[in-house]
């Protein structure tokens, strides 16, 4: 007997969605068991958004739901059990235990330890009765002695820690959550909260939550047989929470699109109060497969006053955003260069800036340059022996650009000319610098509507994301080059 997931949803008629997910918890270990038990009839637990829409439709709680629906409203579908099948993405999620009480919908998905086709009788699914007991226990806890919305918010903020004791790994141990509350020594909601020693003050003003996702992509490209190109994405999620109260609670969910790359090696700030085990165990050392946890990644936390890094992560994206080759050959007193760059079709073609820096170390100043470029502009810094290819804000429709030419140098001055111990002879590189706003290579984003804030006032929530190049090198394929490996990119 176990539960795959549990939700608390406030019914809000007149709002665009007619409801808000106030709390949700998934149990990845139980989900893996469901995949094994159910076999070909397995239907995964959906994200909060699709579940909310499907449940409100099935319960006839949508404002615009006035038409007769045969599959739901016919006489053959009269429901007296509070157990439903939700049609989500063309598949039916069953059984879903759900009921409405005091404008709050309580719902859970019990584990069925057998195939779902044909559908087994309810009396044989022991998790259903446990699900009712679980939800009634949560209801009793939320509304026992509850007088106003602030007390309800406080109790909702305590649920993540309470369920760690009352329902670890989806298995209900004690439906009386008050027992777990006493065991964890929570302060009673009637007692004033104490100012924590690490929080030097409290915020007063308009509530707002700002979320910023920054991904940096590193790459070493060689265009050589026997030497593999390497690339790595490192992400940082930064938050600034201006919220009134001594101990406000916030839950932020990071989501991925269907074809997104799973997040790995996740490190979180100490203010994060709890995490699903699947988030902590996802590692870049493990081989990627279809069973890799792909979110949503939920981070409940009590924010400090200042801006802070909520978490760091890595990801193994299938291809680098820009592929290229660089060829440089010395011909008598000049260098002949050929460069080709191609933007991958899946990458957003809208840069804040994009440049290729082409340095020539251990040589004299540039005295003569002849070149031909298919796109962009070339700037010459003669004394620095540097070319900067300004690509601009977009690649052409072909997604491919090229630059070729010859460079002649004057006499070398050891005091002024750039020196590098690695780039000797024909060993050379070009380095890409670019930034793309409102985009991440993994597809990771923070859904503003899924942010849960347990504090007074309705905060303004903003979310931003960007992709930045970092140590993005393309080496001369006609000469030796230093070799790195994926594990060393960090």
Swiss-Prot record:
Q: Which GO terms describe its biological process?
A: endosomal transport; protein transport; vesicle-mediated transport
Q: Which PROSITE patterns match?
A: MHD
Q: What is its main location?
A: cytoplasm
Give start and end of each MHD domain.
Answer: 206-476
**Which keywords does UniProt give here?**
Cytoplasm, Endosome, Lysosome, Membrane, Protein transport, Transport
Mind telling me which InterPro entries this protein's record contains?
A: AP2_Mu_C_sf, AP5M1, MHD
Q: Where in the cell is it found?
A: Cytoplasm, Cytosol; Late endosome membrane; Lysosome membrane
- Pfam families xref list: Adap_comp_sub (PF00928)
Membrane topology type: Peripheral membrane protein
One GO cellular component term noted in the UniProt record for this chain: AP-type membrane coat adaptor complex
Kindly state the tissue distribution recorded for this protein.
Answer: Expressed in various tumor cell lines including Jurkat, Hep-G2 and HeLa.
Q: What CDD domains does this protein map onto?
A: AP_MuD_MHD
Q: Which proteins does it associate with, and in what oligomeric form?
A: Probably part of the adaptor protein complex 5 (AP-5) a tetramer composed of AP5B1, AP5M1, AP5S1 and AP5Z1.
Family statement drawn from the similarity comment of this UniProt entry:
Belongs to the adaptor complexes medium subunit family.
Physiological role: As part of AP-5, a probable fifth adaptor protein complex it may be involved in endosomal transport. According to PubMed:18395520, it may play a role in cell death.
Q: What is this protein called?
A: AP-5 complex subunit mu-1
Q: Which organism is it from?
A: Homo sapiens (Human)
Lineage here is: Eukaryota, Metazoa, Chordata, Craniata, Vertebrata
């Amino acid at each position: 007997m176990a539960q795959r997931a549990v939700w608390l949803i406030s019914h809000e008629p007149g709002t665009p969605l007619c409801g808000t997910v106030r709390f949700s918890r998934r149990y990845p270990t139980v989900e893996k068991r469901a995949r094994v038990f159910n076999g070909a009839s397995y239907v995964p637990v959906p994200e909060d958004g699709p579940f909310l829409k499907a449940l409100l439709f099935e319960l006839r709680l949508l404002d615009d739901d006035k038409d007769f629906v045969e599959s739901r409203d016919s006489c053959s579908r009269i429901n007296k059990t509070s157990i439903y099948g939700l049609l989500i993405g063309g598949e039916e999620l069953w059984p879903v235990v759900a009921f409405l009480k005091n404008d709050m919908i309580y719902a859970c998905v019990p584990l069925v330890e057998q195939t779902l086709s044909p559908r087994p009788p309810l009396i044989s699914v022991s998790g259903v009765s446990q699900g009712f007991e679980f939800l009634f226990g949560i209801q009793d806890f939320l509304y026992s002695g509850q007088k106003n919305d602030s007390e309800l918010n406080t109790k909702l903020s305590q649920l993540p820690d309470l369920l760690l004791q009352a329902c670890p790994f989806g298995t209900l141990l004690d439906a009386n959550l008050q027992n777990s509350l006493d065991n964890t020594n929570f302060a009673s909601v009637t007692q004033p909260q104490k100012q924590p020693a690490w929080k030097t003050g409290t915020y007063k003003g308009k509530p707002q939550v700002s979320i910023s996702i920054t991904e940096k992509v590193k790459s070493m490209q060689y265009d050589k047989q026997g030497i593999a190109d390497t690339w790595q994405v490192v992400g940082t999620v930064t938050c600034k929470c201006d919220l009134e109260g001594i101990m406000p609670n916030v839950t932020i969910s990071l989501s991925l699109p269907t074809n997104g790359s799973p997040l790995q090696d996740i490190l979180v700030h100490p203010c994060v109060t709890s995490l699903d085990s699947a988030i902590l165990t996802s590692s870049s050392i493990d081989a990627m497969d279809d069973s890799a946890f792909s979110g949503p990644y939920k981070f409940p936390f009590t924010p400090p006053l200042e801006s802070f890094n909520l978490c760091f992560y890595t990801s193994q994206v299938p291809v680098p955003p820009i592929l290229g080759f660089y060829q440089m050959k010395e011909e008598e007193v000049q260098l002949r260069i050929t460069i080709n760059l191609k933007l991958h079709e899946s990458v957003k073609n809208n840069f804040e800036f994009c440049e290729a820096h082409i340095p020539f170390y251990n040589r004299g100043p540039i005295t003569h340059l002849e070149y031909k470029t298919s796109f962009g502009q070339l700037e010459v810094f003669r004394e620095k022996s540097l070319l900067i290819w300004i690509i601009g804000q977009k690649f052409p429709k072909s997604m491919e650009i090229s630059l070729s030419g010859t460079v002649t140098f004057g006499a070398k001055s050891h005091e002024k000319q750039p020196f590098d111990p690695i780039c000797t002879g024909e060993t050379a590189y070009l380095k890409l610098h670019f930034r793309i706003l409102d985009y991440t290579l993994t597809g990771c984003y923070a859904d503003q509507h899924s942010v849960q804030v347990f504090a007074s006032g309705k905060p303004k929530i903003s979310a931003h994301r960007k992709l930045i190049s970092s140590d993005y090198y393309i080496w001369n394929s006609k000469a030796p080059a230093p070799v790195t490996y994926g594990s060393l990119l960090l």
